[in-house]
Amino acid sequence: MLIGAGERIAVPGRADMTYRFRAHSEYLYLTDRDRPGGILAFDPHDGWVDFVKPVTRDERLWEGASTEDEVGVSVVELATWLERRRDRPIACLGAPMPHLTSMDGLVADLREALNAIRRRKDEVELARMRAAESATSAGFAAIAPLIEPGRTERELQIELEAAFFRNGGDSVAFETIVGGGPNSAVLHFPPTSRPFADGDLVLVDAGAEYRGYASDITRTYPASGRFTSEQQEIYAIVRAASERATARCTPGIEWREVHRIAATTIADGLVDFGLLHGDPQSLVERGAQSVFFPHGIGHMVGLGVRDAGEVLPGREPSEDDFPRLRVDLPLEVGHVFTVEPGIYVVPALIHDAQFRERYRDAVDWERAESMLDFGGMRIENNLLITDGDPEVLTGDVPLVA
């Protein structure tokens, strides 16, 4: 078995620049080494060999790489290692190694075996995740008092990320999302110079990374300091969905059941609000809530913002049963998940002809049309599954009252 770290990727048109390197999570998990070009090899008869790429003079000149990065066996020796095993099947994990041919079935089996180990976080991993959460919490604390009409999405991003780095974060776990007003309805909106207006919702989805381990938090704020009555009603529905889904995150529960609880809570709330019509459970069976809750309830987080093997082998997503749900497995002690319900008024979905026909009797389309400038709301926390109630790792980041 070979597990590749991956190589640097050049920035197009810039001969001496590369994107920030991050080793493939499978390699990083097994070696705790974040250098390009490494290949970890395993033979059940002979054990592990860590093949590393020699540090070049240019790397020392431009990047400050040291001989400490060369601890291991030179990758030049990999050819000899492979030649001695040329009659045996190879499985290549980690970053792609197109010059080698591996057995797909063997790769799938080994990857799932590794995923099963990686899903359950040990104390070292949890310590790193808590450090990432701490930096992220500091970032959200820094921006909360700054949110006001006239402030821009970009300004918030700058202050948030600066606080991440001041408080121990190594990098951002993913591209920071800040959307104000109608932009808050775009699930992954990149910040712009748009200033917040009076009455806007401001959605911030961000996280720091520490030694490869990620945090992923979302909060939604009123730009004016207080929600309007309409915004407060929707926020209460999202918060109820978050609390009920969180309470259900216990060992043995199927993730799709957690999603179902959140979806039903949202459907129930939107019936009372007047955007949906009908029995909440029947609406969820039809998927009507997805007009306003168009994503899954969450995902695994850990070594990267989307962690290991979120769908068990043999389970295929069903187009008839939560088609947007990307996680399908039972919860176990040591798993870490995001729980992130939201409600959005997305013009593209409100104007979608197929949705209009499919849910013509389930959605108050006229009411939805009147809310096209509403934007969106999401609450996202990171949960550690324990023997008892789940531990909210992101509990230091306050919700809006």
Language model segments and positions:
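Active-site neighborhoods and metal-handling regions in enzymes and metal-associated proteins
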Residues: 1-401
